[in-house]
Amino acid sequence: MSGVLSCVLRACACAGLCCWVCMGAICGGCQRWWRRRCARWGRVGPRVRSGDGARWVSRKCETERAPSAARSPACSPHFVLVSSSSSSSCSSACSSRPLSSPPSPRAASHAVCAAGGCDLPTHDADGDADEGTDVTLSERAGADEGAGGNAAGCPEDTRGFARSPGDLMGGMNGDLGDEGETGEGGDNGAGE
């Protein structure tokens, strides 16, 4: 009796396993078929006789379909929406490059000073001056030692950048030998 029971249990287990595998394959094929139909038909999908089936298809298609341009995910302020094409996530719809920030007054004055002929030392990310630039600055400013400022009269702070556009224009329009708000000059000939 126990042998028959074990055989039946074994047969049921085998049949259940086979049924589970077959249903998984069938359901997987059905899901892929519905995904293709949802992508083709949009939100509503095909009409189904059963009301519950129609609601299920509608919810399924709503979940499966990619968001439209109007429903595209909002990007954070630091990212740019590169295209309005449908996408499934913000990472694919938004560019990873950050927005270009406006130049600071220090950078703007440094650019103006460089355009006016100043050979200011540039700085690396750690704030140190590039090697070899101070030598050029010393050679250029050596002839004007004691005249105040550097070769083109651009004021410098301790880090080598121009201070502000107002100080810059005042230093360029004034006498090279004057000592004003821009600080004392003539120290560049020695080099650092």
From Swiss-Prot:
Residues 1-24 form the signal peptide. The keyword Signal applies. Residues 140-192 are annotated as: Disordered. Keywords: Signal. This is Uncharacterized protein DR3.
